[in-house]
């Protein structure tokens, strides 16, 4: 089988690096285009971990050139930059998996939390790529909004329980992420003397992923729920651990509900005890555990924020869009010990 040509726009950051690593070894996709805002370097010089692995040139991003050479583009760009690039590539008949927030939300919510939207036409038909809940739509899609990392871990855990929640129940989400989730650019919070041996909340009750979680609960759960979202930065390189608390209508067997919903999902692992980051770091798996005490529900989920929360989820979405096996090229072995 001839490999399908694909490209990455935005190879300089952590998610771009993860895309590079997976696509360079993908059995059905050929990476023929890698770009950033400057170009003029090889991937091994841009990412020292790839020296001696690939001599692929990094080019200056050009939507026309990208569309000419690729059937599908992965956009690992900041919000607003992504929609500008995607709009032109889509107009040239190519498919896009966008890892930014530009196509994840309704117009009203996006503009309330980000900026004016510059591609309303494509926003209206973008598919939110949470595979276990949108597989059929993804297969038919031309544009995928790749979910955010916190929403991925939170939604996969709580969505099966929405029908069982008390009508007045809010969701309380305690989320902890490795520092790579803050991106490659150095900030005060990610500076080594700040984050080392430290743990703190940031953007409490105001993080941009809060409306994303709330909107998708309303989409798939058919009920609006108030989401109280508190993210924390941890002194870990990668990984994400989420605890979601809610109030049930009546006592349930929490693990039985998860087994019924996810029994045939190859990348959801249901655990018999609370989850841990070490078991998922370096993989595409989402591990979930849940328990209830009376009408109180606790859902515990873990993912690799750079993989299941970004780049491997993007690869899985592309696989489905291109008619390939969903799990092709996805990492399964954790970085353990």
Curated annotation (Swiss-Prot):
SUPFAM superfamilies assigned to the protein according to its UniProt record, in alphabetical order: Glyceraldehyde-3-phosphate dehydrogenase-like, C-terminal domain, NAD(P)-binding Rossmann-fold domains
GO terms, molecular function: N-acetyl-gamma-glutamyl-phosphate reductase activity; NAD binding; NADP+ binding
Alphabetized UniProt keyword annotations: Amino-acid biosynthesis, Arginine biosynthesis, Cytoplasm, NADP, Oxidoreductase
GO-annotated cellular components: cytoplasm
Designated gene of the protein: argC
Protein family membership: Belongs to the NAGSA dehydrogenase family. Type 1 subfamily.
Primary location recorded for the protein, binned into one broad class: cytoplasm
Reaction equation(s) it catalyzes: N-acetyl-L-glutamate 5-semialdehyde + phosphate + NADP(+) = N-acetyl-L-glutamyl 5-phosphate + NADPH + H(+)
Function: Catalyzes the NADPH-dependent reduction of N-acetyl-5-glutamyl phosphate to yield N-acetyl-L-glutamate 5-semialdehyde.
Locations listed in the record: Cytoplasm
EC number annotated for this UniProt entry: 1.2.1.38
SMART domains given in the database record: Semialdhyde_dh (SM00859)
Enzyme's top EC category: oxidoreductase
Pathway assignment: Amino-acid biosynthesis; L-arginine biosynthesis; N(2)-acetyl-L-ornithine from L-glutamate: step 3/4
Name under which the protein is recorded: N-acetyl-gamma-glutamyl-phosphate reductase
GO BP annotations, alphabetical order: L-arginine biosynthetic process
A family per Pfam: Semialdhyde_dh
Active-site residues, record numbering mapped to chain: 149
């Amino acid at each position: 089988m001839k490999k399908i040509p694909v490209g990455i726009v935005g190879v300089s950051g952590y998610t771009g690096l993860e895309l590079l690593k997976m696509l360079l070894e993908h059995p059905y996709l050929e990476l023929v285009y890698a770009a950033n805002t400057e170009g003029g370097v090889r991937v091994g010089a841009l990412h020292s971990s790839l020296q001696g692995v690939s001599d692929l040139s990094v080019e200056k991003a050009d939507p026309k050139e990208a569309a000419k050479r690729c059937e599908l583009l992965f956009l690992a760009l900041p919000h607003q930059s992504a929609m500008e690039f995607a709009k032109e590539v889509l107009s040239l008949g190519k498919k896009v998996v966008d890892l930014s927030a530009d196509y994840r939300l309704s117009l009203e919510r996006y503009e309330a939390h980000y900026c004016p939207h510059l591609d309303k036409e494509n926003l209206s038909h973008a598919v939110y790529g949470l595979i276990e809940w949108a597989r059929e739509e993804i297969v038919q899609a031309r544009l995928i909004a790749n979910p955010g990392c916190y929403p991925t871990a939170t939604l996969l855990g709580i969505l099966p329980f929405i029908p069982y929640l008390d009508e007045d129940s809010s969701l309380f989400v305690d989320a902890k992420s490795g520092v790579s989730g803050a991106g490659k650019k150095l900030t005060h919070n990610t500076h080594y003397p700040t984050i080392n041996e430290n743990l703190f909340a940031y953007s409490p009750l105001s993080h941009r992923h809060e409306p994303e979680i709330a909107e998708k609960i309303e989409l798939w759960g058919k009920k609006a729920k108030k989401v109280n979202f508190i993210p924390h930065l941890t002194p870990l390189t990668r990984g994400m651990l989420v605890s979601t608390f809610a109030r049930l209508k009546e006592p349930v067997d929490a693990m039985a509900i998860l087994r019924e919903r996810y029994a045939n999902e190859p990348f959801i692992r249901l655990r018999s005890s609370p989850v841990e980051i070490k078991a998922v770091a370096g993989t595409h798996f989402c591990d979930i555990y849940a328990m209830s005490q009376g009408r109180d529900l606790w859902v515990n989920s873990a993912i690799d924020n750079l993989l299941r929360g970004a780049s491997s989820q993007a690869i899985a979405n592309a696989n489905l869009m291109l008619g390939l096996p969903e799990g092709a090229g996805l990492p399964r072995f954790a970085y353990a010990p």
